[in-house]
Amino acid sequence: MNTFGTRLKFTSFGESHGVAVGCIIDGMPAGVKFDEEFLQNELDKRKGGSKFATPRKESDKAQVLSGVFEGYTTGHPIAIVVFNENAHSKDYDNLKDLFRPAHADFTYFYKYGIRDHRGGGRSSARESVARVAGGAVAAMLLREFDICVQSGVFGVGTFVSNLKEEEFDFEFAKKSEIFCLDPKLESDFKNEILNARNSKDSVGAAVFTKVSGMLIGLGEVLYDKLDSKLAHALMGINAVKAVEIGEGINASKMRGSCNNDALKDGKFLSNHSGGILGGISNGENLILKTYFKPTPSIFAKQESIDKFGNNLKFELKGRHDPCVGVRGSVVASAMVRLVLADCLLLNASANLNNLKNAYGLK
């Protein structure tokens, strides 16, 4: 499906080499200050064009078509479109019948019987423009509650930061070309990406996300837990293969006496749970890690088959990220913002007191 969310519904549209990509955000309350400069800044962070990303250069100028009047949301659907200006579709002519390894070509074709071979269509990282735009709008609502979502890269290939989570440097990441959270590893990360690119290959990456200013009570029990919603959102990003919350995999190696977050004087003494207990936020920082596979589009010679079953050897053309996880850090923040904004709105009717307060009743 192309729609995400329960109370705040986000729908993306468009293909990598189509006319445009964009989104519709439905359910945003009226009266939220709309920050168009922030929206554009988020899209600019996601843009390619550097030696650490795809050479494809797009202006990515957002056009807000509806849902905003005199600087504030109206409560009606917000439509945002970004036109594609620099697609080189001819680079993909030789792929019309070919299934690229590790891409969605094979599965899209056998599911739908038709696929857009130009840059991968909907399965392209280009679709993430819409996610970042939607996440920026969600952030405008979260600001009203002082909830802040930040992401950065803590691992590239075999190079992984050994800093403690509280030591990650988000201020440094804001200035880093690759959103690196560990200043001592930035050069290693960059070299790993460039080495992969120069050898006609690609490399994976690990992204850390922290949410501060969290409220208690976001998320539902059982099947709509906050952690399951976050995992759903992050796993829906192209190239993501794993998500951890709190201690994540490490929790399976621990004793309960170490993993439990004790309380004293009304405060948690640790945050192994990553800010979520029983599927509901406990007010501590949300801690998430998202793992991206290497970009499947590489320039080394590969083997595959075409839709007729013929064995083929081929070399790709086009413009591709040597490490899709770098720009993926911006997308991770966007998806987390969409989840939290949705949960925030759902929580307004979680109990009778909340509902009465919405109508000024006691």
Swiss-Prot record:
Pathway: Metabolic intermediate biosynthesis; chorismate biosynthesis; chorismate from D-erythrose 4-phosphate and phosphoenolpyruvate: step 7/7. Its EC number is 4.2.3.5. Pfam families: Chorismate_synt. It catalyses: 5-O-(1-carboxyvinyl)-3-phosphoshikimate = chorismate + phosphate. InterPro entries: Chorismate_synth, Chorismate_synth_AroC_sf, Chorismate_synthase_CS. FMN binds at residues 122-124, 238-239, 278, 293-297, 319. It comes from the Bacteria. GO terms for molecular function: chorismate synthase activity; FMN binding. Reduced FMN (FMNH(2)). GO terms for biological process: amino acid biosynthetic process; aromatic amino acid family biosynthetic process; chorismate biosynthetic process. Keywords: Amino-acid biosynthesis, Aromatic amino acid biosynthesis, FAD, Flavoprotein, FMN, Lyase, NADP. GO terms for cellular component: cytosol. This reaction introduces a second double bond into the aromatic ring system. Belongs to the chorismate synthase family. PANTHER family: CHORISMATE SYNTHASE. NCBIfam families: aroC, PRK05382.1. This is Chorismate synthase. The gene is aroC.
